[in-house]
């Protein structure tokens, strides 16, 4: 039954995409080999948590925050409401992880400066955060294009109001009464969907960078373990980075899977808050849940042929608003000829345009909110990067 349920979910999702939006573009295949591939690293991390109280505290906090984000994604998946807010929530979570990593770097700045391998980790950190900045910038650019569309539709409303009071309708001019209004409405349609393929490209880029980051950390951690086994600070920093990267890939994997198969993320979230005696073991336990859920759903993540365009799902609510606006516009265009002939219908037309105006106000307000969130995310990441540079570059060379 679970197998059939998964297939049904996928078929429903695919048919819905065909009905409600453009064909989907492929997204990155989700990683499911993490637990087995990094089993020794996870064991090392668990052992380190037992010996290091600071690392144990970090792990406990990380566990709690990860449970929150996974539970939130599961709740949204159950209601089929994964949208731009969900994606921004995930990136806010990743931002928080990066900020915590920055604090660890600063607290260990002397060791960072003296150890070339640890400095290499910092370099990888900057490369990783630059990808997140790119994504935030893309969101902001999409918001700017959306604002242009809303200015056009607002102007269309003003044109309608102006042309509605124009009584100079002689002969054939009656049919041309709303010419300017129609021109603006057509411009609005021509603008299309401001949230195009850029977002899915940026999401893939961030995801790839996180996986590369994790692989590089794996190599660097082993070097540090061999060279600096007795240096507590170095082990702590490397473990913090490893945990941050590992959880980032886990959460991004769950997000990508949720786009096409909500039951998977729900299975991951179920029981994820249960107490685990050994600190650090929750990494393996959570990923094990994820693997089992995927296998139950016919190896969903590994074999899925029907990929999902991330921005189609992430921007679901936004696209719904635009589709509703287009529906109103289409209805308005059909009633224009009748509205100019009958006063009652013209008043109805005016009410319809006022309704559009109110809806656009709410839409624009939401877009501004998303833009502010993206700008805030960019600002915090940029400040964190500068803060790291100030502390590291400000240290004496000797």
Swiss-Prot record:
Membrane-traversing stretches: 240-260, 263-283
Similarity comment: family membership: Belongs to the UPF0496 family.
Keywords: Membrane, Transmembrane, Transmembrane helix
Cellular component, GO annotation: membrane
InterPro entries: DUF677 (IPR007749)
Protein's name according to its UniProt entry: UPF0496 protein At5g66660
Location relative to the cell: Membrane
Pfam families xref list: DUF677
């Amino acid at each position: 039954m679970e197998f059939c349920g998964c297939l049904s979910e996928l078929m429903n999702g695919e048919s819905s995409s065909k009905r409600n939006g453009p064909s989907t573009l492929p997204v990155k295949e989700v990683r499911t080999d993490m637990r087995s591939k990094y089993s020794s690293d996870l064991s090392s991390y668990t052992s380190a948590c037992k010996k290091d109280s600071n690392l144990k505290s970090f792990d406990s906090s990380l566990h709690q925050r990860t449970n929150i984000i996974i539970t939130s994604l599961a709740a949204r998946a159950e209601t089929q409401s994964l949208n731009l807010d969900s994606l921004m929530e995930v990136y806010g979570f990743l931002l928080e992880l990066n900020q915590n990593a920055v604090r660890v770097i600063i607290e260990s700045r002397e060791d960072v400066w003296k150890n070339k391998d640890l400095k290499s980790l910092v370099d990888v950190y900057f490369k990783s955060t630059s990808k997140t900045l790119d994504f935030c910038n893309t969101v902001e650019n999409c918001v700017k294009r959306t604002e242009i569309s809303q200015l056009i539709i607002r102007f269309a409303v003003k044109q309608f109001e102006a042309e509605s009071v124009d009584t100079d309708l002689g002969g054939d001019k009656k049919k041309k009464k709303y010419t300017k209004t129609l021109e603006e409405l057509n411009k609005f349609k021509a603008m299309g969907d401001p949230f195009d393929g850029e977002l899915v490209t940026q999401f893939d880029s961030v995801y790839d960078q996180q996986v590369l980051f994790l692989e590089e950390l794996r190599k660097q951690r082993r070097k540090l373990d061999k060279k600096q086994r007795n240096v507590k600070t170095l082990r702590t920093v490397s473990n913090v980075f490893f945990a941050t990267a590992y959880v980032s890939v886990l959460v991004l994997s769950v997000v990508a899977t949720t786009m096409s198969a909500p039951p998977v993320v729900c299975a991951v979230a179920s029981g994820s808050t249960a107490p685990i005696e050994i600190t650090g073991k929750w990494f393996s336990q959570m990923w094990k849940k994820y693997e089992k859920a995927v296998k139950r759903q016919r190896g969903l993540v590994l074999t899925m042929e029907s990929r999902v365009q991330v921005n189609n799902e992430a921007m679901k609510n936004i696209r719904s608003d635009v589709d509703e606006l287009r529906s109103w516009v289409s209805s308005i265009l059909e009633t224009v000829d009748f509205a100019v002939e009958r006063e009652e219908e013209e008043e109805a037309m005016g009410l319809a345009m006022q309704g559009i105006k109110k809806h656009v106000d709410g839409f624009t307000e939401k877009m501004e909110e998303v833009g502010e969130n993206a700008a805030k995310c960019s600002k915090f990441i940029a400040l964190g990067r500068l803060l790291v540079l100030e502390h590291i570059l400000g240290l004496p060379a000797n």
